[in-house]
Structures are given as C-alpha cells and as structure tokens.
Amino acid sequence: MIKIAAAGGGTGGHLYPLLAILETLAKRVDVKVLFFAVKGKIDERVVRKDHPEFETVSIDVRGLLRPLHHPKNLWRTLKIGIATIEVKKHLKRFKPDLVVLTGGYISGVVGLAAKDLGIPIFVHEQNVVPGLAVKVLSQYAKKVFVSFERTRNYLREWQDKIVVTGCPVRETEKEAPLKDFVLVLGGSLGSEAINELMEKVYPELQETQFVHSTGSDDWTKRLSAFPNVTALTYIDPMGAYWKKAIASISRAGASTIAEMMYYGVPGILIPWESSAESHQLENALEAERLGYGIVIRENEASPRKIIESIDKVVKKGKIEKMKENPASKISEEILGEIM
C-alpha cells in the first residue's frame, strides 16, 4: 500500500492530468489517496464524484494576483499561511509516502508543507511556461515532469530533475453516441467568446456536425436551436468525444491540447490572452509548431476566419494517436523512485 497526498486544482487544466496520474498508479499498485481540493472549485466537485474512495480535504485558499505587488495579496498571503498550517496537520495525520502536485496555488501550499515535513515531492507542469508554484517547488522536488521539451528553458537550474513526458490524459472505455463531428470546447468553465463566435458560424456550415461544450445551461439551450449542433453544458468523460471527433475548436489550456495531441485530432486554437504568464498563447504556438493546430488570436477571430480554418483542419485529417499515455511514464518514474 502506497499512501499518496495530491493537489492540483482550481481549474480542469491542473486537475485532469493529476487524476490521470493517480488513476494510472492505482492500476499498478494499491494506493490510498489524500486529495487537497480548492474550496468551491472544480476539483472539489469532480474528485468527490469520480473518486469517493479518496479522502478529499477542501482548503480555503486563493492564488496571488498579478502583478505580485497587488495590494490584495497581503490578505491572500495571510490566508496561504493559515492554509499551510492546516495542510501540515493533515499530512502529519495521514503520513503519505509521497506527494504528487500538478500546479496551481493549492500545489504551492501543499508542496511547501510537504517540504517542511520531509515528504518526497513529484511535480508535473502541463504548460510550456511553468507557473509560479512549479518554479518554486522544482527546487524541492525529486522529479519534475514536463509536457514539452521547451519547458527546460524556464527551469535551467533543475535540469537533472526534469523528465519530458508529455501531458497525462484520462482514459475512458466510453464512446460518444455520435461520430465525425467537430468538437467545440471553451475550457472547464466554458467560453463566452467562443460561444458567441460559433453562434454565427453554425448557420453557415449546416452540412457539418458539431458537438459544443457550452459551460452554461443558457448557452446549451440557445445553441441547441441549430440542427447541426449537439450542445452540452459539460462533457464527461472528455475522451469519449475526442475519440470520435475529426477536428476541434478550443482554448489552449494544457489539458485540452494534451487530449488533442493524444487522440490525434487537429485543432483550431483560440488562446485566452489573459491567462497567467501567457500560458495559453505559448501552449497554442507550440502545438502549432508541432503540427497539431492553427492558432487564431482572439482579437483576430471572426466567423469567416473560423469557417476557412475548419475547412483546413478537416482536410488535414486525423493525426496518428499517441502510442502511450504520458501518465504511464510518469507512474513508472514515481514507482522507480519510491519502491
């Protein structure tokens, strides 16, 4: 039995790769998991639903605002300190053999608490440009797993710890009830901009079938009016739909790009320009460089440009699916270090 403490939440981009790692580890060895979730965020809801066997602890913490000298960060820093004390109490009680972290502010809290208690730390960075938590925790980690080779350039001091693995993807046996459609995603919370844009595109492409994850019941009702659109408020499991998609339109969050690359689906990427450290833009440009997508800046996105790009990616056809899920390599590395 291996006891694992884990954190990586606030958004689906941090959460789903972490669940992929934990689920893969659980297939190989007996595990007991203590999961630290951000109170009121997606990880709290999804983990309790998908993994009731995990012990899930909700922590009331928020990340630091940018720029870092923002006046509200004084209060947030105090809350981070209080949260770290709370996390330490749980870690002392649970006595984990290791900690697995995938970024986000909750990872910073759990990672620093684990460091103080001498618990081995393993970190995964999904984005091309590492976030603040991963930059800080890399110095204490036994291994730093990264999705892209280029990420090494941002963690030069810790080259001996870095393992390029790709970004883990959750597996599923389920399959969507449709096939040969363009998958439209706005991220785990939906995207108003993508929803509004596609509402103008759908009447022009009535021969093309779309599945659109809207992020809200109102948008689901609104977009369901188009006969060529299957509108869903939330898609779960995502893999069931990626398997059957012929192309995609999405933001450029790390887990979305990971699924796109894993299932070999060419995509149109509209990065969210306000993402921290320009994560999404850098992710999108790297995916485009590797031949997986077309990048359209949000301020340049128009119905006509989307229609032209859909034609290009559909004609490109599906790319060969990855032979191995990065979660497998990460699991092997972790088990090799602790067993």
From Swiss-Prot:
Its main location: membrane. Pfam families: Glyco_tran_28_C (PF04101), Glyco_transf_28 (PF03033). Keywords: Cell cycle, Cell division, Cell inner membrane, Cell membrane, Cell shape, Cell wall biogenesis/degradation, Glycosyltransferase, Membrane, Peptidoglycan synthesis, Transferase. HAMAP family: MurG (MF_00033). One of its GO terms (cellular component) is plasma membrane. It is found in: Cell inner membrane. This is UDP-N-acetylglucosamine--N-acetylmuramyl-(pentapeptide) pyrophosphoryl-undecaprenol N-acetylglucosamine transferase. GO terms for molecular function: UDP-N-acetyl-D-glucosamine:N-acetylmuramoyl-L-alanyl-D-glutamyl-meso-2,6-diaminopimelyl-D-alanyl-D-alanine-diphosphoundecaprenol 4-beta-N-acetylglucosaminlytransferase activity; undecaprenyldiphospho-muramoylpentapeptide beta-N-acetylglucosaminyltransferase activity. Its EC number is 2.4.1.227. It catalyses: di-trans,octa-cis-undecaprenyl diphospho-N-acetyl-alpha-D-muramoyl-L-alanyl-D-glutamyl-meso-2,6-diaminopimeloyl-D-alanyl-D-alanine + UDP-N-acetyl-alpha-D-glucosamine = di-trans,octa-cis-undecaprenyl diphospho-[N-acetyl-alpha-D-glucosaminyl-(1->4)]-N-acetyl-alpha-D-muramoyl-L-alanyl-D-glutamyl-meso-2,6-diaminopimeloyl-D-alanyl-D-alanine + UDP + H(+). One of its GO terms (biological process) is regulation of cell shape. Belongs to the glycosyltransferase 28 family. MurG subfamily. Cell wall formation. Catalyzes the transfer of a GlcNAc subunit on undecaprenyl-pyrophosphoryl-MurNAc-pentapeptide (lipid intermediate I) to form undecaprenyl-pyrophosphoryl-MurNAc-(pentapeptide)GlcNAc (lipid intermediate II). Pathway: Cell wall biogenesis; peptidoglycan biosynthesis. InterPro entries: GlcNAc_MurG, Glyco_trans_28_C, GlycoTrans_28_N. UDP-N-acetyl-alpha-D-glucosamine binds at T11, G12, G13, N127, R170, S188, I235, Q280. It comes from the Bacteria. CDD domains: GT28_MurG (cd03785). It is a peripheral membrane protein. SUPFAM superfamilies: UDP-Glycosyltransferase/glycogen phosphorylase (SSF53756).
